[in-house]
Amino acid sequence: IKPVDMYKESKALIIVAVADEVCAPMCPDCKIPMHKHGTRKNKFSDTPLYMEPVRLEVQRPRFRCESCGKMAMPELSFLDDKRRATKRLVDVIRQQCLGTTFRALADQTGVAVNTVKNIAHDLIDELEQTVCYETPVIMGIDEVNLAGGYRCVITNLATNNVFEMLEQRT
């Protein structure tokens, strides 16, 4: 893509870009060439610039199959598969989400708090697959009143770390 314009909106900096010219793709179902069917503007979140959230406004061509009516747009390799954001923004959020609050990170990047939370959950799920937990040599058990109820906290006293926090006292 090529950036062509930049302007300030109320809460974000908008970078307008156009996609590079692409030849008409083949229909995945019919195996015949698709024809051009107008353009579409899409907005994607990107990493902050000048301490302001950034939105990429990308204008992409759309293609349509004449026989089956299926629509297609060229894929952008820098976008995340799950979200309307760039891969580098998702990487920045993954690096910072465990060290700062979700609200502060959402305000800084201009995405919703739930988006930050979902990225953090994906990171935690990934870490649970790769990180190996050791059983504490010296175990401490206590309870804490958190979020309106008592919870059981199991700690590793040898390393002064929380090993597990259970939903209830028992």
Language model: regions and residue ranges:
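Residue-level detection of the helix-turn-helix DNA-binding "recognition helix"
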Residues: 32, 110, 121, 125
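Short coil turns linking two alpha-helices in DNA-binding domains
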Residues: 101, 112-115
